[in-house]
């Protein structure tokens, strides 16, 4: 099944502690997404000299459930729901549900 949200999409968080924040999708892992500079958590890491990792407290982005983000519509400046439209040649095209405007070129 095709995902409604893809890597590189600009999204808006619509639930949780970071509600209202915008960012770019860095990674999609099944039903979870990692958004740049959103849901920052502190991880306590052990030093690993072989990998060149210094130990300590590291801040990084944690994943968010895909249902808690909406794709940013550049026309309206708001996060909106995305659906699919099947073209005559059988390809699926992502479209905004509110306007029917195509998301992909």
Swiss-Prot record:
A Pfam cross-reference name: KOW
Keyword terms, alphabetized: Ribonucleoprotein, Ribosomal protein, RNA-binding, rRNA-binding
GO biological process, one term: translation
CDD domains: KOW_RPL26
InterPro entries hit by this protein: KOW, Rib_uL2_dom2, Ribosomal_uL24, Ribosomal_uL24_KOW, Translation_prot_SH3-like_sf
Signal peptide annotation: none
Residue intervals passing through the bilayer: none
Family: Belongs to the universal ribosomal protein uL24 family.
NCBIfam families per record: rplX_bact
Function: One of two assembly initiator proteins, it binds directly to the 5'-end of the 23S rRNA, where it nucleates assembly of the 50S subunit.
Name of the protein: Large ribosomal subunit protein uL24
Species per Swiss-Prot/TrEMBL record: Stenotrophomonas maltophilia (strain K279a)
Gene name of the record: rplX
């Amino acid at each position: 099944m095709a995902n409604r949200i893809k890597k590189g999409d600009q999204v808006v968080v619509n639930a949780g502690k970071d509600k209202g924040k915008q960012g770019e999708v860095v990674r999609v892992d099944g039903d979870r997404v990692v958004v740049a500079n959103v849901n920052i958590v502190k991880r306590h890491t052990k030093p690993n000299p072989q990998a060149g990792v210094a130990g300590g407290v590291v801040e990084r982005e944690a994943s968010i459930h895909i249902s808690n983000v909406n794709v940013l519509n550049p026309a309206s400046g708001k996060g909106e729901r995305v659906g699919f439209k099947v073209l005559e040649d059988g390809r699926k095209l992502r479209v905004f549900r509110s306007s029917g405007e195509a998301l992909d070129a």
